[in-house]
């Protein structure tokens, strides 16, 4: 009997190194995929304040700003100052885009509301980013809080009083929407400016992923060109190893359930793909009061608004602008 088993043992010993190499190869391949999609393809900005004559003609002064994130890295963005004491709005782009995609919308918000507007580049995005990789919402959440802290310390042109009042708004698309939602839900009570976004009163969230895992799956599909359930599952595991504990996967519904008092508008449309359904489902997760506004049949969303022309693009922008205007006006009205 022992002699009959020897060929099987020999075969097992022969195949074991092959199997080990196969596992290592698959693991290395998965880590390479995560490494690749964590570094979005960057492009020259679609438009900048300097290259868009219409902004200069209207006397708009959009400045380049830098500030520190909570982990010591440097963030950057454009700033358009509003009226002293007015609210501020932070615009957060989607994965694979950059701040220039939202420049026109932000200028319109400033002109209509007199709000200060900040356009950050999220991690790994924009021309020649100093932070080369995204974390699919983990670090971006604290980066948004750091952006709010930066806005709080701005002074008026006279240098005496704060430029921004006590109210803030977030507009975000996909990755930006998740970061805005997570930053608001994770805000601590006012008192620690570097870590609190508790003064956020209005949120416009366009095409929100159900979780960072879903966002990771969309990024994998976009970069590799196909969608495979097994590959997505393996990539999620590889992401946890790749980011060494810095990858978080708190779902959007849990985050939404923690909001208290913010006005929320959820937007999406057919061009957002599966994110349309995750956005629709998210509407059920907010506290009963105030209810979330929901429009998921838009012909244009934050995915395509930057390139939309004519009435559809104007309709989308007007929807966002009117929401912020009403939210800030209602919030400032004394209650009896």
PLM-predicted stretches and their roles:
Residues 110-129:
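Conserved alpha/beta-hydrolase
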Residues 185-245, 257:
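Hydrolase active-site cap/lid region
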Residues 134-162:
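Alpha/beta-hydrolase active-site loop
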Residues 86-94:
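Short beta-strand element of the alpha/beta-hydrolase
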Residues 11-67:
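An N-terminal hydrophobic leader/cap segment in hydrolases
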Residues 95-108:
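The serine-hydrolase catalytic nucleophile loop
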Residues 159-174:
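Alpha/beta-hydrolase fold nucleophile elbow
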Residues 67, 76-78, 212, 237-335:
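Serine-hydrolase catalytic core
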């Amino acid at each position: 009997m022992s002699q009959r088993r020897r060929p099987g043992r020999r075969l097992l010993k022969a195949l074991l190194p092959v199997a080990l190499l196969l596992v290592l190869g698959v693991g290395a391949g998965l880590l390479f995929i995560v490494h690749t999609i964590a570094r979005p393809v960057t492009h020259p900005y679609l438009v900048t304040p300097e290259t868009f004559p219409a902004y200069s003609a209207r006397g708009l002064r959009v400045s380049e700003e830098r500030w520190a994130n909570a982990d010591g890295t440097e963030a950057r963005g454009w700033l358009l100052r509003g009226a002293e004491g007015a609210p501020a709005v932070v615009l957060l782009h989607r994965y694979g885009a950059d701040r220039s995609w939202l420049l026109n919308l932000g200028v319109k918000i400033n002109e209509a509301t007199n709000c200060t507007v900040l356009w950050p580049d999220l991690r790994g995005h924009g021309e020649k980013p100093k932070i080369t990789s995204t974390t699919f919402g983990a670090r971006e959440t604290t980066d948004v809080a750091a952006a709010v802290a930066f806005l709080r310390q701005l002074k008026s042109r006279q240098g005496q009083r704060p430029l921004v009042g006590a109210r803030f708004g977030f507009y975000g698309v996909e990755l930006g929407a998740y970061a805005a939602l997570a930053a608001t839900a994770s805000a601590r009570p006012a008192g620690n400016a570097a870590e609190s976004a508790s003064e956020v009163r209005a949120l416009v969230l366009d095409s929100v992923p159900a979780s960072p895992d879903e966002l990771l799956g969309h990024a994998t599909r976009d970069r590799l060109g196909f969608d495979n359930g097994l590959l997505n599952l393996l990539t999620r595991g590889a992401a946890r190893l790749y980011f060494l504990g810095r990858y978080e996967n708190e779902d959007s519904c849990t985050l939404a359930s923690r909001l208290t008092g913010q006005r929320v508008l959820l937007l999406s449309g057919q061009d957002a793909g599966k994110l349309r359904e995750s956005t629709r489902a998210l509407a059920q997760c907010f506290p009963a009061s105030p209810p979330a506004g929901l429009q998921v049949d838009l012909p244009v969303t934050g995915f395509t608004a930057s390139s939309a022309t004519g009435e559809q693009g104007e309709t989308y922008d007007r929807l966002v602008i009117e929401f912020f205007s009403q939210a800030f006006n209602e919030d400032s009205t004394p209650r009896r």
